[in-house]
């Protein structure tokens, strides 16, 4: 795919001649959507980039709001970590390229220019990580501008379950390397960063995995399309994908419960990123110090967002991370 000259959004393009206060900061209590309870044998499902059968809605999942206190990590960024919370804050990412070096509307440009820096940042942040494989990226924008980006995900979710993580390893690493890598520690980690920070609109909230119980996470099914929904144009394709291919995997939908602790990083900038851990195989080991190993997360609307604030424009890079420990 050849890079194009399509314009990309900037803060100035959305906030011309507007003097804005700093982004909202501090703890905030605000509604977050959680999936409704399903009674077996019914289960929640969602079709993504994959037309459902005639007469079938693309999803049967309905969100129900709960008032959640989201704690601000600004000034205490090191108070969370991957082993306990499945969340880590990265700062000082001056070596991660941005516009105009990266054309965000070109998959080829993102893969060649942005991916290597993300892989290096993750290896630096996660001790013992020897292999990082990016299997997709997704760009989100609150106004769907200038190309059809996805909007922020406004419902709490967990992108993959443990079995889905195993399937991802086998799918993307192949029949030889995949089983070998599954003998060590394997994880799915999202690298999330704004493309026009600081973020004012729809920041991301993440629940500490140590505070979310397994029985508070419902298991739903996502039906993903082939090229359009699973690997392209969201990221790196598998070898010779079939455009008609369909792929299904389990994902998690949490219930809100007392005792959960939710966090966000106010005014996150382009030299910062969040590592959001979706799965860590070490959490399954007896006497493991990893607590939960999976972070449910959601965008949320901050009622303190000032009028005329810039839209949120961000990228989420999904990575398989392998280590020997």
From Swiss-Prot:
It comes from Penicillium oxalicum. Its EC number is 1.-.-.-. Keywords: Oxidoreductase. GO terms for molecular function: oxidoreductase activity. Pathway: Secondary metabolite biosynthesis. Induction: Expression is positively regulated by the oxaleimides biosynthesis cluster-specific transcription factor poxB. Belongs to the asaB hydroxylase/desaturase family. It comes from the Eukaryota. This is Hydroxylase/desaturase poxK. The keyword Hydrolase does not apply. Residues 1-12 have a biased composition (Low complexity). InterPro entries: AsaB-like. Hydroxylase/desaturase; part of the gene cluster that mediates the biosynthesis of oxaleimides, cytotoxic compounds containing an unusual disubstituted succinimide moiety. The first step of the pathway is provided by the HR-PKS poxF that serves in a new mode of collaborative biosynthesis with the PKS-NRPS poxE, by providing the olefin containing amino acid substrate via the synthesis of an ACP-bound dec-4-enoate. PANTHER family: BLL6449 PROTEIN, PUTATIVE (AFU_ORTHOLOGUE AFUA_3G13140)-RELATED. Residues 1-25 are annotated as: Disordered.
């Amino acid at each position: 795919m050849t890079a194009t000259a399509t314009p990309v959004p900037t803060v100035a393009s959305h906030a011309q001649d507007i003097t804005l206060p700093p982004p909202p900061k501090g703890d905030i209590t605000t509604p977050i959507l959680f999936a409704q309870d399903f009674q077996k044998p019914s289960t929640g499902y969602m079709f993504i980039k994959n037309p459902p059968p005639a007469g079938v809605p693309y999803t049967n999942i309905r969100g129900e709001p709960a008032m959640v206190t989201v704690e601000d990590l600004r000034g205490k960024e090191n108070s969370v970590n991957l082993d306990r919370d499945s969340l880590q804050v990265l700062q000082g990412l001056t070596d991660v390229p941005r516009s105009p070096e990266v054309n965000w509307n070109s998959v080829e440009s993102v893969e060649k220019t942005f991916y290597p820096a993300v892989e290096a940042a993750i290896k630096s942040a996660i001790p013992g990580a020897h292999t990082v494989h990016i299997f997709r990226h997704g760009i989100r924008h609150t106004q769907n501008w200038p190309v059809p980006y996805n909007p922020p995900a406004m419902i709490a979710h967990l992108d993959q379950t443990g079995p889905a993580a195993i399937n991802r390893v086998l799918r993307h690493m192949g029949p030889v390397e995949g089983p070998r890598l599954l003998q060590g520690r394997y994880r799915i980690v999202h690298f999330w960063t704004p493309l026009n920070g600081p973020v004012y609109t729809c920041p991301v909230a993440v629940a500490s995995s140590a505070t979310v119980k397994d029985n508070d996470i419902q298991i739903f099914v996502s039906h993903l399309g082939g090229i359009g929904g699973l690997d392209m144009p969201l990221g790196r394709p598998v070898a010779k994908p079939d455009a008609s291919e369909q792929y299904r995997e389990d994902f998690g939908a949490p219930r809100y419960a007392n005792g959960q602790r939710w966090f966000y990083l106010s005014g996150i900038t382009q030299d910062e990123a969040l590592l959001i851990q979706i799965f860590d195989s070490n959490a399954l080991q007896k006497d493991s110090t990893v607590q939960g190993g999976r972070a449910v997360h959601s965008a949320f609307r901050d009622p303190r967002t000032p009028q005329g604030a810039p839209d949120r424009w961000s990228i989420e890079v999904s990575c398989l991370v392998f280590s020997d420990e």
